[in-house]
């Protein structure tokens, strides 16, 4: 049975772990980067079409107050890049996504 829209499942915990890890190492978190890490480290969302699912999860996490989004100008004529940061509420869930931090 599918989870209710906006619930926090394993995919969202993986995304929180990625953003937390990126912040800890001084890296930026943006949709494409998060999707790439999901593919290479967690071996999920392997198809290009799955990128849109990552953005849906990011939107859910933002609406839940677990991450924030800010815009950063892209290089040259590229569009602005949406950067994601984990909030204090998101950090409080570290015990739920800690197992994924160990993979990263």
Residue ranges and their predicted role:
Residues 54-64:
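Basic amphipathic alpha-helical segments that dock to polyanions
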Residues 62-72:
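A short, conserved structural fragment
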